[in-house]
Amino acid sequence: MQKTIPMTAYKSTRLSGIIKIPGDKSISHRSLILGGLASGETHIHGILESDDVFNTAAAMQALGACIIKKDDLWIIRGTGNGCLLAAQKPLDFGNAGTGARLVMGMVGPYHMKTTFIGDASLSKRPMARILDPLQLMGVEIEATHGNYLPLTLYGPKMTNPICYRIPVASAQVKSAILLAGLNTAGTTTVIEPILTRDHTEKMLKAFGAKLEIEKNAEGTRFIHLNGHPHLTGQTIHIPGDPSSAAFPIVAALLIEDSDITIENVLINNSRMGLIETLWEMGAQIELLNQRQTGGEDVANLRVKSSVLKGVTVPKERAPSMIDEYPALAVAAAFAEGKTVMLGIEELRVKESDRLSVLAQGLKINHVDCEEGQDFLIVHGKGSAKGLGGGHVTTHLDHRIAMSFLIFGLVSEKPVTIDDKRMIATSFPEFIPFIQQLGGKIS
């Protein structure tokens, strides 16, 4: 068993410089999956080279795609839609929840057996929300531990198209059903009451799928996908991940006299919740050189240290920032006044019970906070005095690890995390990037 690698962050002064954040994790997974399904070659620039993404790439190779890496360019020769091969051994997704769930949707309709396994953290994450619609489509599931990994899917001879209303806002559920619809005759419809990140819809259209979106007066989206489309390989330029950018953004806002620029960051409307919330708190964040890359909105972010005040974050905003709440909680700890985060029960089924672990980490660093089943209230002091000094147990959660290292850059006393290794699942360059800007982590 590998040894844990603790890491400590110390109070830092003035972050400055320009960095380019790694590629967006959501788009990286989807690029590999759709590129592996499409006919011809897909060229991917700027892919996130992290453990999670490598695991999805390995799964696509096991299912018949050919993937070649040439420097920063990834070239995929896809199987063609409907032509995946049966994997010869279980698909091991490590910690990659997105990869596992999306590939379950993709392979579910294939008349073959596919087994999914993962690490200890992923094996605790519920899969029922993906498996329920797949069962309605005719997929049989064999799982020894309830709706958790390891599990095996047995695809039917003929898949049923479904009309499925998503019970909880989830881009992964929506995407898994749409990917299943690619190899299903007829029209598959997903009803989405609350908008979640829409990369799958945009990319399906770009690859050639016949997909239509309707919206009613209440804002509910009806996404219709015609089955068995011909998908054609594309050239994809992946913008920087806003979920990773969250950490240097919060650090620069909180550390006095900081002024940093983060280049080429995705600013898709369905991913802007954190920046909107920080603006409400008083953050100086400018969107510079706004442009479009591959159908996605992109900008450079200039971030200057700011005096923040507490706010209430409505539950409706949660889907657009679900991965950024740990970073927001750090900002809230140093803001003036109370910050209330509502409708965040989804955090309980992330890499850890992220809501509980976040509250515990704040408390051992002397932050006054209240945790509820679906909310977190942080009482900010408006200063770093008396904060920090804690040893945070990260529970194999990369976002908890990065959040409390950022906390330690700001707090009066150093903060130590028990293990830095899982940071590689989403942001391998995190520590050197922060050090490059002037942050003290060792």
Curated annotation (Swiss-Prot):
Belongs to the EPSP synthase family. Pathway: Metabolic intermediate biosynthesis; chorismate biosynthesis; chorismate from D-erythrose 4-phosphate and phosphoenolpyruvate: step 6/7. GO terms for biological process: amino acid biosynthetic process; aromatic amino acid family biosynthetic process; chorismate biosynthetic process. 3-phosphoshikimate binds at residues 25-26, 30, 170, 172, 323, 350. The keyword Cytoplasm applies. NCBIfam families: aroA. GO terms for molecular function: 3-phosphoshikimate 1-carboxyvinyltransferase activity. HAMAP family: EPSP_synth. This is 3-phosphoshikimate 1-carboxyvinyltransferase. It is found in: Cytoplasm. One of its GO terms (cellular component) is cytoplasm. Monomer.
